[in-house]
Amino acid sequence: KKVKTFEEKFAKYTGTKYAIMVNSGSSANLLALSILTNPKINKIQKNSEVITPAVTWATTVYPMVTNNLIPTFVDVDPETYTIDVKRVKDAINKKTSAIMPVHLLGNACDMDKLLKISKNENLSLIEDACEAHGCEFNGKKVGSFGDIGTFSFFLSHHITTIEGGMIVTNNENYYEYAKSMRAFGWIRELKDKKKISSKFKSIDERFLFTNLGFNMRPTEIQGAFGIHQI
């Protein structure tokens, strides 16, 4: 109940439809890219390139490698330490599938320009906002612009649950996959679990797995910490 309440409050806070809590910001990045590369989603193709800034934390990059993606590093704007939009344009080629900007130290990336590029080039846009809770670009919270936004609640961040993370999205399909994939690929939290389980009548729905997945589940204590601070 605490985790669910925190998720609902965080979605409202960021101006997004859905929020899914996980056990760390690193897990949030891994889950986001694992959803978009999932064969059933196939928004980002394996062995394609993802443009990301050279100034970031390691776990922005590791999930790319884990999902057989190729990180393409570009420099940052020295005024803000966020991704240099001109260099993003220069780095795009036929192998590029996504852009993963990082809102760093409370500074927002230029989301208007990045959105325009991603739409014109048909690229996915994943926002790493792990260090930018509450930051806004033109009055809109970061994390809410792209396909998926990620946040961290590590003890040194603006909101802390000691350890914890969140992904936000406006896409219901991504939300359903996130609920399943953060918990082993279970169907337990899915809205269509009865429909799915009816196809596998010999298997107890409590033990039905229909997806790739991880154990990224947060605890109720983490949820309570989050509620208190939101």
Name each model feature, range by range.
Residues 2-49, 63-67, 73-75, 140:
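Phosphate-binding glycine-rich loop
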Residues 15, 46, 95, 144-145, ...:
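Short loop/turn motifs at secondary-structure junctions
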Residues 37-104, 108-129, 136:
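PLP-dependent aminotransferase-like
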Residues 117-122, 140-148:
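Radical SAM/AdoMet-radical enzyme domain recognition
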Residues 132-138, 145-230:
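Active-site region of PLP-dependent enzymes
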